Each structure stands twice: as structure tokens, then as C-alpha cells.
């Protein structure tokens, strides 16, 4: 009787151990919406002669973008400024969702729009301490350029973004160091 129980337990144990090997492999995930993505990262830095916390107080609110990008209108259309999930609208059309933050940084993403190829655009603005009295602003962009025609178009797009955001970093430096920006040019 005892040997029958031992044999039954051994058989059950063997079946349990073999079950995962006999289980069906999980189904393959559905294909990617963009199967041949061409992700790029554009990282720009600007030295600032102020402590990081002081810099962040000047340029780090989610809609401060309107102050350091002259002529750009920013409004919070969902959530609360500075809280995860807050949505800002730029110039009445571009939406950006606050998806991550630290005491001296935030990251945003642009949502998917119907009828447009999604480029997975994300941006991060950070005030990074360098010394007790100095810091640097770091602006990082990550996006997919696969919808652009060729390498020349991708290079042009990256250079355009780098130029625009490098100017924004210079303007943030000016404001953080106590300066004022010139009013936007008349259109």
C-alpha cells in the first residue's frame, strides 16, 4: 500500500515537473505598428551660473515653456500643472502629457493622433547640479524618424530640432541668471 502511494506521488510529481515543458508556447505578440522604427536621441546641454534648485524654480514649471520660448502659448487643459498626467496645449494644438518627474526634471510625451503616424516623441528637461553654485540644463528628445523619406530628411529634422531646443536652453539660461528675453518678433 505504501509503495503504491509512493509510486502515485512520484508519477504526480513527474507530471507536474513535465507540464511546463509540454505546455504550448505563448502566441507571438501582434506586429509592431511601426516595424522598422528609426529611433534617435538628441541630447543638448547648457551651463548655468546658478544652483540647480534655483534654476528649476525659474524654468521648471510645466507651462514655463511659454516664458522661455517667446511667442509660445501654453495652457494646462487637463490635470494640475506639475502633476503626473497633466496635459499642456501649446499654441492651441500640440498636446503634451507629463509622464515622469523628479524634483529637478520632467518628461513629457505627445499622444497618438488619428490619421497620423506616431513618432513616439518624448522630451525631458532637467536642471542638473554641477557645483553648489552652478548647474547645467539638459534637454533630451527621443523620437522615431522612420516616417521621414530618407537619411537627408532625418538629418534635417534632427538639426532643426537641435537648433530650436538649443535656443530654448540659451533663453532658459538667460532667465535663470536673472536676465530678460527680447519680445518675440512680430509676425
PLM features: what roles do these ranges have?
Residues 1-11:
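Bacterial N-terminal signal peptides that target proteins for export
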Residues 18-20:
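N-terminal signal peptide c-region/cleavage motif recognized by signal peptidases
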Residues 23-80:
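Hydrophobic ligand-binding cavity/cleft-lining segments
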Residues 25, 184-187:
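Short, solvent-exposed mixed-charge patches
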Residues 47, 64-70, 74-122, 136, ...:
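Glycine-rich portal/gate segments that line the openings of hydrophobic small-molecule binding cavities
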Residues 53, 152, 156, 174, ...:
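Surface-exposed, polar/charged faces of alpha-helical domains
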Residues 53-57, 63, 163-170, 174:
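Solvent-exposed, polar/charged alpha-helical surfaces in well-ordered, non-transmembrane soluble domains
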Residues 113-167:
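Beta-strand/loop substructures that line and gate deep hydrophobic ligand-binding cavities in soluble
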Amino acid at each position: 500500500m505504501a509503495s503504491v502511494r509512493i509510486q502515485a506521488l512520484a508519477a504526480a510529481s513527474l507530471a507536474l515537473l513535465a507540464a511546463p515543458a509540454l505546455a504550448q508556447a505563448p502566441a507571438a505578440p501582434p506586429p509592431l505598428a511601426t516595424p522598422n522604427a528609426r529611433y534617435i536621441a538628441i541630447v543638448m546641454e547648457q551651463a548655468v551660473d546658478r544652483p540647480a534648485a534655483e534654476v528649476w524654480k525659474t524654468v521648471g514649471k510645466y507651462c514655463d515653456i511659454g516664458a522661455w520660448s517667446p511667442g509660445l502659448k501654453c495652457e494646462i487643459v487637463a490635470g494640475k500643472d506639475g502633476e503626473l498626467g497633466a496635459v499642456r496645449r501649446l499654441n492651441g494644438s500640440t498636446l503634451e502629457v507629463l509622464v515622469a518627474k523628479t524634483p529637478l526634471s520632467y518628461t513629457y510625451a505627445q499622444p497618438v493622433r488619428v490619421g497620423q503616424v506616431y513618432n513616439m516623441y518624448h522630451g525631458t528637461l532637467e536642471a542638473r547640479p554641477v557645483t553648489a553654485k552652478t548647474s547645467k540644463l539638459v534637454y533630451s528628445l527621443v523620437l522615431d524618424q522612420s516616417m521621414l523619406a530618407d537619411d537627408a530628411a532625418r538629418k534635417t529634422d534632427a538639426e532643426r530640432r537641435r537648433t530650436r531646443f538649443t535656443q530654448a536652453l540659451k533663453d532658459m539660461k538667460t532667465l535663470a541668471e536673472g536676465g530678460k528675453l527680447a519680445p518675440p518678433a512680430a509676425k
